[in-house]
Regions:
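Signature for HUH/AEP ssDNA processing cores
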Residues: 1-110, 119
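DNA replication initiation modules
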Residues: 67-85, 108, 116-183
Length: 183
């Protein structure tokens, strides 16, 4: 659960694009919104109309990267650190300051994601390492889904998400991957 101050911060920077997360799937909680499949079954869909009370009482929260799931309306993107040894996580200091998701790990508290506002310049696509955390993935950028920002094992900093030069960010992410590989 989050405080009213933290929710006010989220509303200021993400407006209605805050969602309750299903703790089992780590995806937005699906809600029946009156729509049906062709065979008549109820259709459960992602939802962004949560009340402040529902958001404050939720154990898991996330922010959508795109407004109303529209590809042409990005609002934020995330740098996601996936290094199983947490070496890449420590190189987050090379990134421009912005809202961060801090996770409790076996190595202590680590920045797990850095979230940036997306402007007209775009956001770099980075997927460095293996196919998954277990197969050697170090860093990736997330732009089309949701970032889990609050859960029992993580919380977020109340630093406003900043806009970033995509070329500069890409250079810094490549540098982080290089430093992680040689460390």
């Amino acid at each position: 659960m989050i405080t009213r101050d933290k929710l006010k911060f989220l509303r200021e920077h993400f407006d209605k694009n805050i969602t309750v997360i299903n703790p089992t799937t780590k995806k937005p909680k699906a809600v029946y919104q009156g729509n049906h499949y062709a065979d008549g079954r109820k259709k459960y869909e992602w939802f962004n109309g949560w009340t402040d009370e529902e958001l404050c009482s939720a154990e898991y929260l996330g922010v959508f990267h795109r407004e109303d799931k529209r590809k042409d309306k990005p609002i934020c993107a995330a740098v996601d650190f996936d290094d199983i040894d947490y070496v890449a996580h420590d190189w987050n200091i090379k990134l421009p300051p912005s809202m961060s998701v801090v996770k409790e790990t076996k190595s202590g508290k680590k920045v797990n994601q850095r979230i940036y506002k997306v402007n007209g310049s775009g956001f770099p696509k980075i997927d460095y390492g293996g196919d998954s955390k277990d197969s050697g993935k170090l860093v990736e950028t997330l732009q089309s889904g949701v970032s889990v920002i609050h859960a029992p094992d993580r919380t977020f900093t109340m630093i406003p998400p900043s806009q970033v030069d995509p070329k500069e960010l890409e250079k810094n992410l490549n540098l982080i991957c290089f430093f992680t590989e040689v460390q």
